[in-house]
Amino acid sequence: LPRDVRAGGLAIRIRDFDRCAAIVVTSDTSIIQKLEQRIRGISVRAAAVTAELAELKHERVRETVSQLQREHAAPSGTATLLTAVKSSLNKMRQEQKTGDHSESLLQSADALRNLRHLQFLCWKDATAGLCSPAASPHTTAFATLPDHWRLMNRVQSERSQLANHLRWSATFDDAGSLQRDGWERAAADKTLFSTTTDVIPAGAGGRVLRLAAWPADPTGRSAVRDDVVPLVLTSPVVAVSPGDIVIVRGRVRRGSAVASGSRSPLLLYDTELGPEHGLKQELTSDWQEFELIRPIHRGREFQLCASVLTQAEVHLDDVQFHLIEAGTSETPVRMIGTSGR
């Protein structure tokens, strides 16, 4: 291996470090010999299995890219990577015929590495315009990226007239808006956390929603349980139908009244997908806009939940619910899991 002697030690650069690679540092060279013997013993099987995996992954990725290109231009570098993968697979097949299992394994690993890079490029391209990957339900897997772009194309076609799809909004202009609009509050046991949800002044005559939680024991001697959510505030119900698309927009920031050790103390999620697909942004004292795009699969009622995960103060404002009604049979909007594998 290339070695670079530096002050305090030795720097070694390892090329093509794969996910299954191993580094052994030992003064007993017999260990290396035993390891090499084990590798030779499984080399035939390892080469065959890795070759099969590379072939299957190439077919799956190629198929997904083909579907994606019907909805959106593939990112730069896609064609080059696919060409490199094909070249590696051709070399791998040739090495299998000659019985060079070690080289066959290296070519398979090279193909898999380029396929992972291609998947990452497509995912990065898909999430570039979102406030978070969690904003769209179809960015959680490479196989559903075609569904993501189909969803984005449908939303983009309505962007210019999104105001016409506004179903409900909350600007928290007065102290009674929470109760009047029908927000629901759920808090942890008072022996664990003290909490508040109220509307407070925010300069220039405006008001914002404040959510805050802090330990009930001011001395800090009581243990704070990680499995307890201090505060959850749930929005009023918005009626929906399967095939609709709900877009929730708003802005959020960190307050200063309660110190928090977490950079992401707030979880925003919806009743269609649940907290597992929630949005956790790193909050600062500056306002950050958020947007959740949710295709409705089977729900009839849709709500936004704002969950304070630890001691913190956060502010929420300008919450808007937009509803794009279900597409036609000619332009359907697919739900989670309807394409890909």
Listing of model-derived features with the role each one plays in the protein:
Residues 38-95, 123-148:
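Amphipathic, heptad-repeat alpha-helical segments
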Residues 36, 54-58, 87, 102-110, ...:
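Long beta-sheet-rich domains in secretory-pathway and surface-associated proteins
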Residues 143-341:
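Extracellular and organelle-lumenal recognition/adhesion modules and their flexible linkers in secreted
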Residues 28-42, 118-127, 324-332:
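Short, charged low-complexity linker/loop segments at the C-terminal edge of domains
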Residues 82, 89, 96, 101, ...:
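Inward-facing hydrophobic residues that define packing positions of alpha-helical scaffold repeats
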Residues 7-12, 232-233:
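Short alpha-helix capping/helix-loop boundary micro-motifs
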Residues 11-37:
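C-terminal beta-strand-rich structural cap/linker in extracellular carbohydrate-active enzymes
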